[in-house]
Amino acid sequence: MIPRTLAAGTLTLAAAGLLASAPRAQDVRRGAALFAETCAACHGADAKGDNGPNLTALWAAGATDDRVTQTIRGGIPGSVMPPSAATDEEIRAIVAYLRTLAAPPPAAGETARATPERPQRVVLVTASGEDIRGERRNEDAFSIQIEDDGGRLRGFLKKDLRDIVRGDAGRGVPARDRAGADPGIGYRDLLDGLKDPSRWLTFSGDYTGRRHSPLTHITRENVGRLAAEWTFQTGTVTRGRGFEATPLALDGVLYVTGSNDFAWALDARTGRPFWQYRRELPTDLTYGAMAPVNRGFGLLGDRLFMTTLDAHLLAFDRRTGRTSWDVTLADYRVGYSATVAPLVVDGKVIVGISGGEYPTRGFLDAYDPASGARIWRFYTVPAPGEPGSETWPAPEAAARGGGGTWMTGTYDPELNLLYWGTGNPNPDYYGDDRKGDNLYTNPLVAIDARTGVPKWHYQFTPHDTHDWDSNHVAVLADVTIGGAPRPSTGSGRTEPVEVRKVVMVANRNGFFYVFDRRDGTLLVGRPFTDTTWAREIGRDGRPIVLNDGTKSCVPDQWGGTNFNPPSFDPALSLFFVNARETCATFVPQAPKIAPGRQNFGGVVRVDREKAYGALRALDPATGERRWEFRYPSPSMAGVMTTASGLVFAGDNEGNVMAFDARTGANLWRYATGNPIWGAAPMTYLLDGRQHVVIASGATLLSFALPDRAGS
């Protein structure tokens, strides 16, 4: 049977010669008939999408004939699309037909939204009479985007301008030669985090990972008037995933990455692009084709930093979108990829790696932001003789032991410690050839930012056989702990009340943890979802395991939560997370291991009958639930809070919502039309108005109160 759901896909079949020549007319006719019979029910009669994604946009989004062919051949793990039993000729015919429906892809670096083909000098005359000279980057009937002669990207609404004078060819000088040029972002700016509410400079907004904004323009009283301000359609598609990036905001510009290694600089007022970047990717991607996502930029000076699906780290000039340097992290052909949003700390760009479903060895790297030279590397699976190597049975198991680092961590500048989670051991579900705890897979690791040496670690799921990566945002805060029995021990012993410097993690295994971030002391360890695999955390800090998953286990392989970011409101001292209530049976199988080949080591049978999702507020002092708001299905959306007492979240049904952080009462919702997968809201102040932005499907949406209503 030919599968019914298709999205941009994976490995090349060029060697098989399936698509070596131009499509023949008879192939197109046969492909149209096969598509109507087996694919149209999900993808629509015109292939523009129904329950399944739009297939006419695949090539414009960077897919190739080879990738689409392999997606049909192999299916999409974890989705309703199984591997296909179709013949090579049938697959070739379907791809040939789809190719006739596809628009041509944009050229590399080309902006897809009416960017002027030739540069044009302009003088913008503001309402106050100020002349702003620069080069036009984009324009529509209502707005214009320029790079001014100081090198700043600036967007204007035409209603706010007195005049636009065009063709000012001789009156400008190169931006870098002018006084008052954009000074860029320094380390001090990153340390300040969200003190300037017009900015959002890191993946989580600041180094703490709280995703908590000081803005109060949108309140419990007026959030019901929140309305869509603009949308930006990326035109990219993923394999049943979503648009997972968090934009960075600086001086009225949003910098955002997308699927298939696209990236844009957008006018934060209108969503119109100043520039677009598109990476030319190899056709034989491994993990990068399975999950062609990207989670965002890092920022320092006038440079942006981005990882790529073929496991590179790039530096861009943020004014132009042109690359400054390009370094290789690892060999993508083995199974490596990179999707993490880099974290820039003092003199270093910190990046992780993906590929734990392949025979890879995870690591975390630090690079010089000026040159791209590597400063240090921490391997998440130790070499023979190193601390932790005793938890692996043989060097060959450790050499392919997994432990990816694909979610952005957090940073305490006072302690100079990075807090980073790592992923599952490899193979995911089959553990017979890797007896032991398998360090450092599935822990939180506190790493010296200067040297890359781990200071302490805590392993959430020793010897994991459930694919419960610990790639979560670890949230830093100062929390009052004590005065009640410690939930991690259940001993009834009362602890003294004190304010502790903590790091908090809602883990994929269904437990919520609070540690002293200075030394890793476990303060709280308590389930925040139903769990059948473990009863509690024992006195030794290890889970008391009840069920290995082969007899139905809670949670499933996607976990009690996943990489979708949580949030923390320091005024309320509440931790907010989208929880998943799920169940599955894990069936381990010995895999065939080879470079570039996925090896999950089994299958998972998910019971969806009773599954649901919930936004939950947790007390970090005890781990107790304060309130919840339920969704009909598990959500993979992230969370954001604001100082006005609001929680913003999303769900799998495509709703972006606002809640009263104190009670969980729903105050506002907007139906985006696509599941919100992995993305979390962010917010910024512009022209005296607070904007809330979130990615949904392949679209970025911005919301604000009507003009002056929130000022």
Regions found by a protein language model. Give the residues of each.
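Extracytoplasmic electron-transfer domains, predominantly the class I c-type cytochrome c fold
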Residues: 41, 46-51, 55-176, 200, ...
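Repeat-blade elements of multi-bladed beta-propeller folds
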Residues: 200-204, 240-262, 287-313, 337-358, ...
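Structural recognition of the beta-propeller blade-terminating site
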Residues: 267, 317, 368, 448, ...
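Conserved blade-ending motifs and adjacent loop-strand segments that build the rim/top face
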Residues: 463-465, 470-473, 529-535, 541, ...
